[in-house]
Amino acid sequence: LLSKIIKTAYAPDFTMEDINGELFTFSELKGKLILLDVWASWCKPCREANPEMVELYNKFHNKGLEMISISLDGTPEQTSPKEDWKKAVSNDKLTWTQLSDLKGWDSKIRDSYNIRSIPYTILIDQNGLIIGQDLSHEALNKKISEILNL
């Protein structure tokens, strides 16, 4: 039953700073297919998955996919979370919208989207409905292709 509820849930709106300090509001992308990728610079599996995210972006962005990465950098163990985040974005060549409130696991996005582990992906359709969560690279590829009629 829970999976059915989640599949028909609307994606909560949020506003967060991007990597350049500009405010970004999620609802500005209404009407687009969106892939949210939640990660952090200190998360080894996240960093290992970043090349797959780059591949998805390169394959689907010009065909209608918007990608947003949200970093959970800002844990108490980090002495310079913003620098860690910026360096990882640069090193991993993440060229799409990058957001973080630099609050680590206390980030408001965590509760809004019920995120318990990272990396974590959330696929949101053009109507703002969450249609997939924590999907594998293969599953994302397939689902995005289907939605964009490719």
Residue ranges of each PLM-predicted region?
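Short active-site neighborhood of thiol/selenol oxidoreductases, capturing the structured segment around
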Residues: 25-47, 53
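Thiol-/selenol-based redox modules, centered on thioredoxin-like
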Residues: 118, 123-150
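N-proximal helix/coil linker or "cap" segments that precede and/or mark the start of modular domains
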Residues: 1-22, 27-32, 58, 83-90
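Structural microenvironment flanking redox-active thiols in thiol-disulfide oxidoreductases
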Residues: 48-92, 103-110
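Short, internal strand/loop/helix patches
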Residues: 17, 83-122, 126
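Active-site acidic short loop of glycosyltransferases
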Residues: 30-32, 62, 94, 115
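N-terminal targeting or signal-anchor segments and their processing/structural boundaries
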Residues: 20-22, 34-37, 74, 106
